[in-house]
Structures are given as structure tokens and as C-alpha cells.
């Protein structure tokens, strides 16, 4: 169960304005339902899930590890999910290595050293088949495989996830191919093979799918979150700070940053997302939040139940929640508006539900801002600049 509290620590005048904003709910829902880009709200289908799961089992049975090559919406969701449930001092049972976010030569050199004695499979993910970083690193790894096994054997180490529009990547030989539907934008593609295939190597994706669709019951909560965020922006709160108290959720906040920044940040509008880990950042950014420029509001992501470890007759989770309650009280007294999202527990099922909730909220906020929630024209600007320089050099 996910609960959203926007009434306890939000200025009363904003809550009064929200009563009027609720009248726009039907308008926003109509825009959403009429969009051609909400394939992510439809059921993926059991046959697709089975195909993904069977391919993941093949990878686990035939390779030492999976190297996921992608960037942005192509992999942030699965990476964030995987990191959230990783043991602090122990890796997942099957190794999944995520690459594609940097073109650092040191990183790529270290990657080859890491893979030197491993029989690895590549899952290259790019909806357009044109993503520069993905093309470069995929070619880099293909060259390594060619040296090891010969050019004709590379295809036996590759799984491709792209759209079925005949792009360069769509024509690459491989073990298996998965399509990202045209009616799903990259950052909304959590319930496609782009994310489910890497996750299926270590998680029960049937449980992920079930939890995800439970988020469709949170339309009212999602609109409440979108509406309050929109009004806070109208009152000069142009930065949203996602506050977490579990370090493994830092990657999840990176996914949130991409989701909301790419959805809203257009036409001079949008809320800038940032994140803090408490209690760590109370000793740095906490000073700014308490007494600095009042340009931000906070969204706390909490969960009630956690592993119980006792300390002087109190369990650590209770102490942690007491600290968070104190932080919320202090920041609110310091004139920072605070929203709270609470899960019963940090579980695979509930986090999947939370993913749907956030995607629904992001799209609703986009409509409130009057922008298209599903495009990212600003990102395409840098891509065109790079294309002019490197397009002839980098091909699949």
C-alpha cells in the first residue's frame, strides 16, 4: 500500500488553491487517455513476459554475466530497481554490468579488464538505434568479442532491444530480439524488455508486472501529487528534493530525475529535480535547506517496515523514522514545504507500484504545465550536434 500525504506540511494557502485545481482533473485525464504514447499503461501480455523470462534463463545458463549497454530511459529503470534490492556487501546471484553512461577511456579499459576472463552476453538497448554512446560502446565490446571468437560468432553473444522500424540496430544478427513499442517513450519503458530482461536474471518479473499494474489504482493520488507539485512551482518552488533514507535508493532517485526533468523541462517550464540521502546530507545540503534560499520543496520517500536491528532497547528502523520525523519538522519550521510518500515496506512489488505511480504523476504534471509529457526535444539538440561530427565514424 502506498500513501501520499500532501496536507500535513504544505502551506495552507496552497492547499486552498488546490481545491480549485482539482477541477482540471477530468481535463488532464482526457488528455492522457487520448495520447498515443501511453502504451506503458496497457498490459504487456503473458507471451511477452514468458519470452523475456526464457531469454533471461538462457543467458544465465550459458554466460558468466550480462553486459547491458544503454543510456537514459533505455536502462535507468532496471539499473535503479536492481541497485535498490542489492545487498550492501554482496552482489546479486547473477552478475549484470551496466555500461553506457560515460565515454571515459579509463572506464572502458577497466571494463575490458573486468571482462577478460568472463564469457559475457551483451544486451544492447536503443529505441532509435541511433544513440551515440550506445553505438560506440556496443562497437567497442563487439570488437572484443571478434578478437575472442571470430566475427561470425559475435551474434551468439548479443541480445538486441530496439524498435521495429528497420533502424541499423534492428538489422543486427543476434540470439534474440525484443521490440520497444513505438507508443512508449524511453523513460516510460520500464515494463518493456528494455528493463524486464536485465531484471529477469535476478528477479521474478511476474511479481514486478503484478506490482506495476497495481499502480493503475492510484490515479487520484497521482493527480494529487502532480497538482501540488504544479502549485508549489507557481509559488516559486522550482526545485524538488527527493529525500531518501536508504542508500541503495540513490539510483532510484537518478531514475526520478530523468523521468521528471525530461517530462517537464520544456518551454522555460518545469521543476528541477535533485536528491538527498539522509542522514548523510543533513551535514551539507541540510544547511541550505534549513536556512538558505527558499526555492525548493521536499518529497520524502519512506517505508514503514524494515529489517529489525536493536540498539539500546530500540530498533534501528524506529530510530531512523524518529530522525526523519524530526528532519521534516525542522525543515517545515524553516519554511520548506514537504510531501511524503510512504510504502508499507521496501519490496519488489511495492517499488513496482511506485514506478507506475511516478510515471502517471509525471505525465499529469506535464499536462498541467501545458507541455507534451512524452517528447524530449532538448535532448535531441545535443544529439544533432554530435551527429554532425561523428555520424560517419560511428555505425552499428
Predicted ranges, named:
Residues 149-298, 378-396:
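Active-site phosphate/pyrophosphate-binding segments
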Residues 45, 98-101, 127, 131, ...:
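Hydrophobic alpha-helical scaffolding
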Residues 1-57, 326-327:
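Extended, charge-enriched "interface" segments that sit outside catalytic cores
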Residues 84-94, 144-147, 259-270, 330-334:
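Short helix-loop-beta junction
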Residues 352-353, 360-396:
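Generic C-terminus detector
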Residues 44-60, 221-233:
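A short, well-structured juxtamembrane/interface segment
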Residues 57-219, 384, 388:
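Glycine-rich phosphate-binding loops that contact phosphosugars or nucleotide phosphates
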Residues 274-348:
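Helicase-primase coupling helices
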Amino acid at each position: 500500500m502506498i500513501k501520499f500525504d500532501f496536507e500535513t506540511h504544505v502551506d495552507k494557502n496552497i492547499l486552498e488553491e488546490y481545491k480549485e485545481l482539482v477541477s482540471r482533473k477530468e481535463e488532464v485525464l482526457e488528455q492522457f487517455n487520448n495520447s498515443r504514447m501511453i502504451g506503458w499503461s496497457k498490459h504487456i501480455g503473458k507471451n511477452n513476459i514468458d519470452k523475456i523470462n526464457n531469454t533471461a534463463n538462457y543467458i544465465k545458463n550459458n554466460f558468466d554475466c550480462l553486459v547491458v549497454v544503454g543510456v537514459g530511459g533505455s536502462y535507468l529503470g532496471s539499473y535503479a530497481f536492481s541497485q535498490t534490492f542489492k545487498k550492501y556487501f554482496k552482489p546479486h546471484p547473477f552478475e549484470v554490468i551496466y555500461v553506457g553512461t560515460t565515454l571515459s577511456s579509463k572506464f572502458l579499459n577497466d571494463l575490458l579488464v573486468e571482462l577478460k576472463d568472463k564469457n559475457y552476453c551483451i544486451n544492447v538497448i536503443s529505441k532509435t538505434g541511433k544513440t551515440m554512446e550506445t553505438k560506440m560502446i556496443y562497437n567497442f565490446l563487439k570488437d572484443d568479442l571478434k578478437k575472442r571468437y571470430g566475427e561470425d560468432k559475435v551474434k551468439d553473444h548479443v541480445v538486441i532491444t530496439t524498435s521495429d522500424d528497420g533502424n541499423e540496430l534492428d538489422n543486427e544478427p543476434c540470439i534474440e530480439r525484443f521490440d520497444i513499442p513505438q507508443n512508449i517513450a524511453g523513460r516510460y519503458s520500464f515494463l518493456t524488455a528494455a528493463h524486464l530482461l536485465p531484471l529477469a536474471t535476478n528477479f521474478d518479473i511476474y511479481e514486478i508486472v503484478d506490482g506495476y499494474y497495481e499502480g493503475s489504482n492510484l490515479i487520484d493520488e497521482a493527480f494529487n501529487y502532480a497538482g501540488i507539485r504544479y502549485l508549489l512551482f507557481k509559488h516559486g518552488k522550482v526545485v524538488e528534493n527527493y529525500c531518501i533514507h536508504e542508500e541503495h535508493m540513490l539510483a532510484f532517485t537518478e531514475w526520478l530525475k530523468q523521468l521528471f526533468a525530461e517530462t517537464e523541462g520544456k518551454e522555460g517550464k518545469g521543476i528541477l529535480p535533485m536528491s538527498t540521502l539522509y542522514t548523510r546530507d543533513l551535514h551539507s545540503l541540510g544547511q541550505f535547506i534549513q536556512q538558505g534560499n527558499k526555492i525548493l520543496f521536499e518529497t520524502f520517500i519512506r517505508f514503514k517496515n524494515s529489517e529489525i536491528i536493536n540498539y539500546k532497547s530500540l530498533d534501528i528502523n524506529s530510530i531512523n523514522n524518529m530522525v526523519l520525523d524530526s528532519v521534516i519538522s525542522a525543515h517545515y519550521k524553516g519554511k520548506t514545504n514537504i510531501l511524503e510518500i510512504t510504502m508499507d515496506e521496501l519490496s519488489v512489488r511495492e517499488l513496482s507500484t511506485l514506478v507506475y505511480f511516478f510515471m502517471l504523476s509525471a505525465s499529469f504534471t506535464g499536462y498541467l504545465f501545458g507541455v507534451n509529457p512524452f517528447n524530449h526535444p532538448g535532448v535531441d539538440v545535443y544529439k544533432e550536434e554530435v551527429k554532425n561530427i561523428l555520424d560517419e565514424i560511428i555505425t552499428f
